[in-house]
A protein has these predicted regions:
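Conserved acidic donor-binding segment of nucleotide-sugar-dependent glycosyltransferases
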Residues: 295-308, 315-322
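Donor nucleotide-sugar binding/catalytic pocket of nucleotide-sugar-dependent glycosyltransferases
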Residues: 119-136, 140-158
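Membrane-proximal helix-turn-helix segments that form the acceptor-binding/catalytic region
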Residues: 80, 104-124
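Conserved catalytic-core segment of nucleotide-activated headgroup transferases in glycan assembly
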Residues: 8-28, 152-157, 163-250
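Active-site proximal beta-strand in glycosyltransferases
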Residues: 78-96
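N-terminal pre-catalytic "stem/leader" segment of glycosyltransferase-like enzymes
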Residues: 1-66
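Nucleotide-sugar-dependent
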Residues: 180, 232-275, 284-295
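A charged, aromatic-enriched C-terminal amphipathic alpha-helix characteristic of glycosyltransferases
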Residues: 305, 322-355
Length: 357
């Protein structure tokens, strides 16, 4: 029996990253392998006693080793009690200067803390090969296992057939960190809102709107083309909890996934594509890593290579409802390999290998 300790800082509340990378995969893992693994959750291990820690075989943490900004002290304690630890990363450990959280991360020494945790970890788990190579090349961590994000449809991402308004409903959802990505669609949306042939045939929904956030207001301005959209063309789905946000997809036919091609974005995960696929939505997506390996243009998506493609492909889908059906059906098939039961199994096998080395 493997005794696993999972550190979820937001526990008992669950943040988005903790939900996808820690809570859900280990929840499913405990069901699949209940006779082989015992999982305990805790929100920090800095204050844990040696006696408590000695009862476990492996501890898993996301990004940071310490909640009290003293990672070296925690690393030394884990070494002292002989408890190996795994750091899970689903995006870059360095924030670009134009990132909305850059200065907060700089003030908190996040890059240094994550680097220290990764360098000293028994192993790391990451979402894809590019991020794994980054950690090996820059931080010297060679013991890395690729464990992608997954979706567990039961409960939060179940298929539903919503009642639409006779229009094609496009939608974008995401956090305020994606403002620069959303801007890629502005010109195309502006043209669409004002095109006589199309302006009454579609609607755009902004998922994750945060009323009190100035950046969220800026995203709303972009998606509505600075108010050019009228009430029949634009709507919002307000920010909600991790167990409810999947309901956004029930309001749309087509998921819009813009992403600028830069280091930080390339090291992110393909989660939005997976969410859209499991909710059986057609997708228009930037042809940018980490999405590009899963994209098949005209088969399971429409790939955007230039900002003008947003208008081109949105009108294409308005004109071709059968293509919407074909794309969403194929993407649903293609993402099934990312079902959480498969991903949780991959993660479990990684843990066994780590402990057997």
């Amino acid at each position: 029996m493997i005794k696993l300790l999972i550190v979820i800082p937001s526990y008992p509340k669950i943040s988005g990253v903790d939900y996808h990378r820690l809570w859900m995969p280990h929840n499913v893992m405990s069901d699949l392998f209940k006779d082989e693994i015992e999982i305990s959750l805790i929100n920090e291990v800095d204050s844990a006693t040696d006696e408590f820690l000695k009862d476990f075989d492996l501890v898993v943490m996301n990004r940071f080793a310490s909640k009290t900004n003293e990672p070296q002290a925690l690393i030394d304690k884990l070494k002292r009690v002989g408890l190996p630890y795994v750091i899970d990363l689903d995006d870059d450990y360095i924030l670009p200067k134009n990132h909305i959280l850059y200065y907060a991360a700089k003030d908190g020494n996040h890059t240094e803390q994550i680097s220290l945790a990764v360098k000293n970890a028994t192993a790391c788990t990451t979402t894809h090969e590019l991020l794994a190579n980054t950690l090996t090349k820059e931080l010297g961590q060679k013991n890395i296992y690729i464990v992608p994000n997954g979706i567990y449809p039961e409960g939060h991402f179940e298929l539903r057939e919503p009642q639409f308004n006779g229009k094609l409903n496009f939608g974008w959802s995401g956090s305020i960190t994606h403002l620069e990505d959303v801007i890629l669609m502005h010109d195309g949306l502006y043209s669409l809102y004002t095109a006589d042939d199309y302006k009454d045939k579609f609607r755009v929904v902004y998922g994750g709107f945060a009323t009190q956030s100035e950046t969220s207001q800026a995203i709303l301005s972009v998606l509505s083309a600075r108010g050019k959209a009228d009430e029949s063309q634009f709507g919002i789905f307000k920010e909600t909890g991790v167990k409810e946000y999947g309901n956004f997809y029930d309001l749309i036919n087509v998921s819009l996934i813009p992403l600028r091609n830069n280091r930080f974005n390339n090291n992110k995960s393909n989660l939005k594509l997976l969410e859209s696929g499991f909710k059986m939505k057609a997708v228009i997506c930037s042809d940018v890593y980490p999405y590009s390996p899963d994209l098949k243009h005209g088969v399971n998506c429409l790939k955007v290579k230039h900002k003008n493609d947003w208008y081109k492909y949105m009108t294409k889908l308005i004109d071709n409802p059968n293509l919407v059906e074909d794309l969403r059906a194929q993407l649903y098939i293609d993402v099934q390999r990312y079902h959480m039961t498969n991903v949780a199994t991959e993660r479990f096998e990684a843990y066994k290998e780590i402990l057997n080395k």
